[in-house]
Amino acid sequence: MKQAAAEIIGEYGPFPGIEKVNGITYDGQHVWFASGDKLNALDPKTGEKVHALDVAAHAGTAFDGRYLFQLSGDSIQKIDPNSGRVLTTIPAPGGGGSGLTWAEGTLWMGQYRNRRIHQLDPRTGAVLRTIESNRFVTGVTWVDGELWHATLEGDESDLRRVDPQTGEVLETLEMPTGVSVSGLESDGGDQFFCGGGSSGKVRAVRRPRRGSTAGSGSATPE
C-alpha cells in the first residue's frame, strides 16, 4: 500500500453565513457544496461563492453531467442546478449517508457510521454493491477508474484509493492532524476538492500523478 502526506494546494472560505460544509461536487466549472439549507456554487478560480440554491443539503452531493443529487436525511434528491427545483427523490439506504458521487450511470454513497460504500440504482435507490471500510466514511469519488473515499477516525482523516471489488486499501493520503474531510470530489484531473466540515472551508488537495495520463472525469467502475 502506498502512503503519503496529503498536499493541500488551495483553500476557500470560510464563507459568510455558512457554518459547516456537508458535501461537495464539481460540474466542470463550479464546486458545489452543501451547507445545511443551501447548495452553494463556488468559482475555484476566484474563490468567490457565485450562486446558491435553497434546498435541504445535510450530507453528500453529486453531479451526473446535467443534474445535482443531494443527500438529505433518509433520501436523495435530484435537483435542477438552474432552478433549484427538486425533480425526483429516492430513498437513501439505511440512513446515515455521508459522501455521494456519480460514475457511469450509478450513484455511489458513503455511510458514515456503518463504514460502508454502496453503489445505488439512481432511479430506485436499490443497492447494487456494498464495499466495507475500517474507518468512518466521509466522502467518495471516482476518477480515471479509481475509487477514492475520505475517512475520519478521532482527529485523523485521510483520502484513500480502494479496490472497488474488495475494498482493499491501495493508497492513502494523510491529512494534517485536526483537518477533517466532509465530502470528496475530483476535478477529473490533478486535484481533489474536500469539504472542511465545521471549519466552513473547501480545500483542494493534489491528486497523485499516474504517469503522463491526464484525467478526464469519472470513469467506469469495472
Explain the meaning of each model-derived region.
Residues 12-37, 59-60:
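Beta-strand-rich domains and repeat architectures in extracellular enzymes and scaffolds
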Residues 12-17, 51-56, 89-94, 130-134, ...:
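Surface loop/turn motifs at the tips and blade-to-blade linkers of beta-strand repeat domains
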Residues 26-28, 63-65, 102-104, 142-144, ...:
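Residue-level detector of Asp-centered blade-edge/turn motifs that repeat once per structural unit
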Residues 31-37, 68-74, 109-114, 149-154, ...:
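Conserved beta-strand positions in repeat-built beta-propeller and related beta-rich domains
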Residues 43-47, 80-84, 121-125, 163-167, ...:
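Short loop/turn segments that connect beta-strands within beta-propeller blades
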Residues 181-222:
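Blade-level signature of beta-propeller repeat domains, shared across WD40, Kelch, NHL, RCC1
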